[in-house]
């Protein structure tokens, strides 16, 4: 499913909640932004690269994480990277190429 998702799949979800299972607890990640990274330069790329930015209430370490959202037909296993601390929250990013 991941290879079929585009930025258009996520733009309507900006501002909504995704859920991550972390240490036995359900953690809310709010999608704050969906942004195009660059135009596809080669025909081998099936989509334009994009990033998703989430706001998390706690530090999420870099790695593959299992996320769910009510609007998506199945859970996503995506690689998240912490990029910034904002007060008591953290911004994490997922890049799709």
Where are these regions (language model features)?
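A glycine-biased structural micro-motif
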Residues: 7, 12-15
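Short, compact, well-ordered microdomains
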Residues: 64-97
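Acidic, aromatic-enriched beta-alpha/helix-loop junctions
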Residues: 39-71
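Short, conserved beta-turn/loop elements at beta-strand boundaries and strand-helix junctions
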Residues: 35-40, 84-88
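Conserved hydrophobic positions within beta-strands
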Residues: 31-33, 80
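Mixed-charge, Lys/Arg-rich low-complexity intrinsically disordered regions
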Residues: 1-7
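A generic structural signal for short beta-strands and their flanking turns/coil linkers
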Residues: 14-16, 25-27, 46-50, 61-63, ...
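Short coil-to-beta-strand transition motifs
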Residues: 21-30, 69-76
């Amino acid at each position: 499913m991941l290879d079929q998702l585009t930025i258009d799949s996520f733009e309507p979800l900006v501002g909504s909640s995704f859920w991550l299972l972390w240490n036995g607890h359900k953690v809310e990640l709010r999608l704050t932004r969906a942004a195009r990274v660059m135009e596809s330069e080669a025909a081998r790329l099936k989509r334009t690269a994009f990033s998703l930015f989430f706001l998390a209430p706690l530090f999420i370490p870099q790695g593959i994480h299992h996320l769910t959202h009510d609007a998506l037909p199945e859970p996503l296993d995506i690689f998240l990277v912490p990029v910034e601390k904002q007060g008591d929250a953290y911004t994490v990013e997922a890049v799709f190429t």
